[in-house]
Amino acid sequence: MLNLYGRKFSSRLMLGTAQYPSPAILRNAIHKSNIEIVTVSLRRETAGGKQGGQFWQFLKELDITVLPNTAGCYTVKEAVTTAQLARDLFKTSWIKLEIIGNPDTLQPNVFSLIEAAQILNSDGFQIFAYTTDDLIVAERLLDVGCRVIMPWCAPIGSGQGPHNTDGLRSIRAYLPDVTLVIDAGIGRPSHAAVAMELGYDAVLLNTAVAKAGDPVLMAQAFAQAVQAGRMGYKAGILKARNIAVPSTPIVGKAVFS
């Protein structure tokens, strides 16, 4: 079971809710893949006006756990204010904390992230911290009270898959008891399987499903890939070798006459 701030979930795949062709397709993708958690931007709710309110009502009817996020924030003040508004709107202390440092790469501003996390933790929030694959940053986020760390594996929406598996593996090795979720950069089910094989606890993605030719089928594919990767990690994956090793042991040699 996936444990997030004391709450347990069966699914280790989380989905974003943006860019789907229609609400009906989003609903089917969630149901067919047995997703239990979706993330949604407060800015979508507020900027959308009446339409945003309708979307929130749509989410409530799905009877699913909502993880609000601070997507689109560039400063500590913006992120803190957005988180506080999200708590009022969604009635949850959960917040996926994102602070962007560069508008082109959408790379997290880890300095502002740590500062905002400290403020929000002192205000009672339970933070899911979207960050880079830097171990030192992850450790600092833990120091200020975060209990779920969400390293990216590649830039948001790029679909490139894990760039730095050594870095991701290092975070897992040094933080064995921390809940780690890969967030951003996943493009195909095999990427999700790799992330889970590294020992990560869950995967969060959006574009790879929302922009697929068949989002519902792709959501199912990702759900199965995440499950397979987790099972492989738990089973114990064979380490790669530089030389061939016979898979069938030879006891003696056949004698031909």
Swiss-Prot record:
Alphabetical UniProt keywords: Cytoplasm, Schiff base, Thiamine biosynthesis, Transferase
Q: Which reaction does it catalyse?
A: [ThiS sulfur-carrier protein]-C-terminal-Gly-aminoethanethioate + 2-iminoacetate + 1-deoxy-D-xylulose 5-phosphate = [ThiS sulfur-carrier protein]-C-terminal Gly-Gly + 2-[(2R,5Z)-2-carboxy-4-methylthiazol-5(2H)-ylidene]ethyl phosphate + 2 H2O + H(+)
Under the heading Gene3D superfamilies, the entry gives:
Aldolase class I (3.20.20.70)
Biological process (GO), any one: thiamine diphosphate biosynthetic process
Which Pfam families did the record assign?
ThiG (PF05690)
Which EC class is the enzyme in? Answer: transferase
Q: What is its main location?
A: cytoplasm
- For this protein, the Enzyme Commission number is 2.8.1.10
Determine the domain of life of the protein's source: Bacteria
Pathways involved: Cofactor biosynthesis; thiamine diphosphate biosynthesis
Query: What CDD domains does the database record attribute to this sequence?
Result: ThiG
**Binding, 1-deoxy-D-xylulose 5-phosphate:** G157, A184, G185, N206, T207
Q: What is this protein called?
A: Thiazole synthase
Species annotation = Bartonella quintana (strain Toulouse)
